C-alpha cells in the first residue's frame, strides 16, 4: 500500500460513479449531496421507511448519520441496513453526538449490534464512548478523551470486525490489525459545520469503489484533506472556504492526491 494505490481509488470512484444512499441529518444534507457529486459519485437522500430497502438495493454504499435523530429515522436506518447487509453493500455509520445523550449513544450501539457496519467514523469522543473508554462529547463535538485514540479505535475495530476511523487533526484508520495515520487537512475544516458529515459521504463513495475498507477510508480522508489544504489557500473565511472546498474536491485529481498525501503506517 502506497500513495499511488491510495490515490487511485479516486479514479475508480469517478469511473464507477456509484450511487451513495444517505439517511442523514437535515443540518448538512445538502452539503453531503454536493460533496458526493463533486467527488464523482451520485447521491440519493431517501429516508422514508416505505422506500429505503428498495432504494439501497440500487446503491454502492449506505451512509447512516445520526446527527438529527428521531425514532422513525432509526427504523428507516435499520430497514435500509438490513437490506444492505443482505446485498453485501457497505455501510458507513457516523455516530454524531454519541456520548452526549443517552438516545444518541444507545442508537449508535443498537445500529452496531443489529447491522454489520463496514466503517464506523466519528470524532475521538464518540469513538471512545462506543469503545467503553472515557470520552467527553459536548453537543456533537469531541471535548477530550482519556487514553490513546489509536488504541481504543484498534480495540473497537477488532471487537466488532469493522473499520474504525477517528477524525481529528490527524485522522486514524484501523481494522484492528492495520493502522494508518492521515495527516492531511487544515484547521479551517473545523470552522465549518458539516465537514465531518461530508467526510463520511466521501468515505461512502470510496467504499463503493474499493472493498478494502481500511484503504478506501484512508484514501477518502486523505483526498478530502488535500482538497481542504488547497481550499484554505484561497479563502477569506468560513463562507468562502466552503465554496472553495467544493470546487477543490471537484477539481481534485489522483495525481494531486498522490503528490500531496500525508499518511503513516503503523
Curated annotation (Swiss-Prot):
EC number of this enzyme: 2.7.1.50
Residues bound to substrate: 45, 194
UniProt: ATP binding residues: 121, 167
Gene Ontology biological process terms from the UniProt entry: thiamine biosynthetic process; thiamine diphosphate biosynthetic process
Assigned keywords, A-Z: ATP-binding, Kinase, Magnesium, Metal-binding, Nucleotide-binding, Thiamine biosynthesis, Transferase
Domain of life according to the entry: Archaea
A Pfam family: HK
Keyword Manganese carried by entry: no
Catalyses which reaction(s): 5-(2-hydroxyethyl)-4-methylthiazole + ATP = 4-methyl-5-(2-phosphooxyethyl)-thiazole + ADP + H(+)
Pathway where it operates: Cofactor biosynthesis; thiamine diphosphate biosynthesis; 4-methyl-5-(2-phosphoethyl)-thiazole from 5-(2-hydroxyethyl)-4-methylthiazole: step 1/1
Single GO molecular function: ATP binding
Cofactor field: Mg(2+)
NCBIfam families noted in UniProt: PRK09355.1, thiM
Entry function: Catalyzes the phosphorylation of the hydroxyl group of 4-methyl-5-beta-hydroxyethylthiazole (THZ).
Similarity-based family: Belongs to the Thz kinase family.
HAMAP family per record: Thz_kinase
Name the record gives this protein: Hydroxyethylthiazole kinase
Taxonomy of the source species: Archaea, Methanobacteriati, Methanobacteriota, Stenosarchaea group, Methanomicrobia
Amino acid at each position: 500500500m502506497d500513495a499511488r494505490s491510495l490515490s487511485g481509488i479516486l479514479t475508480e470512484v469517478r469511473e464507477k460513479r456509484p450511487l451513495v444512499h444517505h439517511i442523514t441529518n437535515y443540518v448538512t444534507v445538502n452539503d453531503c449531496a454536493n460533496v458526493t457529486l463533486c467527488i464523482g459519485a451520485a447521491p440519493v437522500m431517501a429516508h422514508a421507511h416505505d422506500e429505503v430497502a428498495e432504494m439501497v438495493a440500487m446503491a454502492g454504499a449506505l451512509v447512516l448519520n445520526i446527527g438529527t435523530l428521531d425514532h422513525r429515522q432509526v427504523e428507516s436506518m435499520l430497514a435500509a441496513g438490513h437490506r444492505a447487509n443482505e446485498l453485501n453493500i457497505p455501510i458507513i455509520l457516523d455516530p454524531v453526538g454519541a456520548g452526549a445523550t443517552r438516545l444518541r449513544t444507545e442508537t449508535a450501539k443498537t445500529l452496531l449490534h443489529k447491522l454489520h457496519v463496514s466503517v464506523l467514523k466519528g470524532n475521538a469522543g464518540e469513538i471512545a464512548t462506543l469503545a467503553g473508554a472515557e470520552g467527553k462529547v459536548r453537543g456533537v463535538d469531541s471535548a477530550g478523551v482519556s487514553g490513546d485514540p489509536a488504541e481504543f479505535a484498534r480495540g473497537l475495530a477488532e471487537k466488532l470486525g469493522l473499520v474504525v476511523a477517528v477524525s481529528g487533526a490527524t485522522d486514524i484508520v484501523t481494522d484492528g490489525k492495520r493502522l494508518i495515520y492521515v495527516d492531511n487537512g487544515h484547521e479551517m475544516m473545523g470552522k465549518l459545520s458539516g465537514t465531518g458529515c461530508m467526510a463520511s459521504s466521501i468515505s461512502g463513495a470510496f467504499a463503493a469503489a474499493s472493498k478494502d475498507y481500511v484503504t478506501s477510508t484512508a484514501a477518502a480522508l486523505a483526498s478530502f484533506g488535500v482538497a481542504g489544504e488547497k481550499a484554505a489557500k484561497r479563502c477569506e473565511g468560513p463562507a468562502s472556504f466552503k465554496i472553495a472546498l467544493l470546487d477543490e474536491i471537484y477539481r481534485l485529481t489522483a495525481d494531486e492526491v498522490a503528490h500531496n498525501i500525508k499518511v503513516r503506517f503503523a
